[in-house]
Amino acid sequence: MAKAVKSNGSQPLGRRTYKNPPITEATCEFQFTPVDNWNLAYTGIFLERVKARYSGKPREQRLLQLDSKQLPDASGTLPSASVREITKVQIPSADGREMVAVGPGILSAHVLKPYSGWETFRPQIEEALAVYQAIADPSGIRRIGIRYINLIELPAPNAEPSEYFSAPPTKNEELGCRLDTFVIRHEYLYDDEPIRLVVNFAKVQKIETVTVNGASYLLDLDVSREWQTEALPMNRAMSLVEELRRREREAFEAQITPKSRELFDA
């Protein structure tokens, strides 16, 4: 069950920048309405218009998406869900650090580590959105999501998670055992706006650093908003992107401690 959370509204926690941000991937995704005004010809046009920035080899991605009705309809019918297959074409940049993915009713922009900052990622999002809009002319937006995946590497394998994270996993020392690994998922709903925050927190093993004496933690934050009855006008897209990004920043800062911040600024 999702938990309700309060936003700081006009009093954000304050924007922080780090010398070594732990961000491994940042994503912004749009889902449009209608979803059936896209075809292979449009994909070709899109590829041509973004090739200056994304010159890598395109690849196809197929995935299943759960479409749910969040509220009962006028007859009182309970919420239902359906599954549909989405086919996207992913187009990376030459160095593979940036990517855009496009398909029927869906567009996403991605950037990988090293993250160069919101000042670089935001124009990338806006540019891709403008190209999609010029080609498909969607009537509106039904979902926007901002997702940041962070890999936080502690300096020692026995480093105490409670020193670096504000809500560490329980240790259960009274059972005579130690914590080996964990996966925690929390879903939150904001009180002021119908915005959902999903936090995935886990201890992970980096394959390429198995011999390094350290501990790695995944902190995955996904902030999204959906419009079920009336689509968001296209001219309001970037203002909502900014708002979701602001809340993602606040959520990230709320998950970590000053000791983590020292790591990011080392």
Segments predicted by a language model, with ranges:
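Glycine-rich, often proline-containing surface loops adjacent to acidic residues and nearby aromatics
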Residues: 22-30, 98-115, 141-149, 213-226
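Hydrophobic alpha-helical segments and helix pairs
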Residues: 90-133
